[in-house]
């Protein structure tokens, strides 16, 4: 079994060694991929193609998607669910959508099997779980013929969900500020045009969503012995346009900004838009 750690959102899942994990936009995808020798010996056929291809319908077809959402306002689960299920049902052309309470550990939420049009050969299940300010969206989809092989394993993967108190291996900069994975140091002026004293600034470029970055920093700041004096979330009713933390450790005071940017070129910034990081040392 393989343990997957989502460092930004702070959760773990355990999945079979023959499964594949991939990052798909702002979600994490888990798919089974039966090696050809096993498929031939057990079922007389070979697993071929890419399980992430929607047209793939092999023995090992099926996909589990997990996506995080930042819920700083602590909105109730019901409106979040209604939005989630409405978008998903509309996209898939579903007509019958019910829901049932769902609880996993100390995370609570809702789940439903979405009944797709008869001409569609897929089964679709979805659910959302809320824990503190984090909401995890789950989606399981597979051909009806793959149900016997796929659903038991997918259920075990979802049931393995954990929120560890601490995730080891987080890197820090020279001031001791934790850095999310995949972020590289850049010149401050490459992110902010009006930096007149670059020696007192640190800047890091990456592609994590601004919601995921807020989840990361609110968890890691106290672990790394920083005191959070102020937090301005994004999005919010203010016109700040980014997320900001005021941090102090002993005599060192910093301002950390998470600056969202438009990667797609659409001209819009959303709660899942990627963000760069800038740090001002007082």
Task: Describe the function of each predicted region.
Residues 1, 61, 135-137, 199-201:
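Short, solvent-exposed beta-strand edge segments and adjacent coil->beta transition regions
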Residues 1-38, 162-191:
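N-terminal "mature-domain start" segment
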Residues 9-13, 120-122, 134, 175-177, ...:
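Short acidic/polar mixed-charge low-complexity motifs
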Residues 19, 134-181, 277-282:
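Surface-exposed amphipathic alpha-helical segments
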Residues 24-125, 142-144, 195-199, 205-248, ...:
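Conserved polar/disulfide-associated segments of primarily extracytoplasmic proteins
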Residues 120-124, 157, 184-189:
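Short amphipathic beta-strand starts and helix->beta connectors
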Residues 127-132:
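Short glycine/proline-enriched loop/turn "hinge" motifs that connect secondary-structure elements
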């Amino acid at each position: 079994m393989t343990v997957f750690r989502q460092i930004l959102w702070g959760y773990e899942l355990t999945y079979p060694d023959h499964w594949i994990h991939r990052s798909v936009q702002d979600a994490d995808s888990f798919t089974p991929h039966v090696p050809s020798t096993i498929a031939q010996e057990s079922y007389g056929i070979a697993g071929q193609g890419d399980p992430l291809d929607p047209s793939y319908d092999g023995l090992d077809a099926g996909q589990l998607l997990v996506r995080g959402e930042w819920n700083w306002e602590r909105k109730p689960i019901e409106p979040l669910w209604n939005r989630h299920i409405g978008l998903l049902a509309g996209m898939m052309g579903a007509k019958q959508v019910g829901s049932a309470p769902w609880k996993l550990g100390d995370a609570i939420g809702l789940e439903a099997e979405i009944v797709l049009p008869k001409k569609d050969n897929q089964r679709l299940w979805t659910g959302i779980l809320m824990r503190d300010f984090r909401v995890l969206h789950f989606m399981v989809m597979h051909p009806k013929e793959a149900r016997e092989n796929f659903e038991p394993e997918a259920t075990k993967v979802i049931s393995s969900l954990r929120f560890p108190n601490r995730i080891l291996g987080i890197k820090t900069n020279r001031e001791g500020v934790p850095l999310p994975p995949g972020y590289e140091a850049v010149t401050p002026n490459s992110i902010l045009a009006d930096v007149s004293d670059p020696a007192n600034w640190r800047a890091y470029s990456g592609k994590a969503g601004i919601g995921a970055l807020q989840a990361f920093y609110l968890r890691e700041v106290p672990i790394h012995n920083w005191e959070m004096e102020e937090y301005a979330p994004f999005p919010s009713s203010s016109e700040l346009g980014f997320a900001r933390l005021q941090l102090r450790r002993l005599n060192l005071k910093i301002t950390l900004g998470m600056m969202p940017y438009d990667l797609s070129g659409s001209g819009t910034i959303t709660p899942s838009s990627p963000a760069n990081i800038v740090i001002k040392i007082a």
